[in-house]
Amino acid sequence: LLFRNNIMRVGELIAYELSKTLDYEERDVQTPLGTAKVNVPTDKVVLGTIFRAGLPFHQGFLNIFDHAGNAFVSAYREYEDDAHTKVGIHVEYLATPDLNNATLLIVDPMLATGGSMEMGYKAFLTKGTPKRVHVVCVIASPEGIEHVRRTFPEDTTIWCAAVDPGLNEHKYI
């Protein structure tokens, strides 16, 4: 429970910082004392998460972006050898709103090889082309960051709370 809550809390903190990069417009809002001018985001934000470990992180983002759409994909590793040194990725389930012109935040706590992130992103693309993509994680490896830089659009922003020195022989952080 403590781990899940802390992952959610990190999600809230990164979401707050990321919110500063969105586009806003000023709108009049009616309050009990009159009309106030407030800045509201104009981006159509969609939170994309790779199932299971990503759920508490997703919730942290949803606590900040409470009007965001929700997208989910199931992607997991398939080991191609007995030593678990060759890794493939399998994608099964996909549920997402239309992503055309959306600001897609792909939130997943760990970015190890980048393979699941890439396959999840490609699955999301079957539902539209986002205007902007942010890849967000709690911890990443240099290999995973480089993989995202090679396989995602050039203007993708990568957000991570920590960068690990590298992957072990089993491709784990």
Residue ranges and their predicted role:
Residues 1-173:
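PRPP-associated nucleotide enzymes
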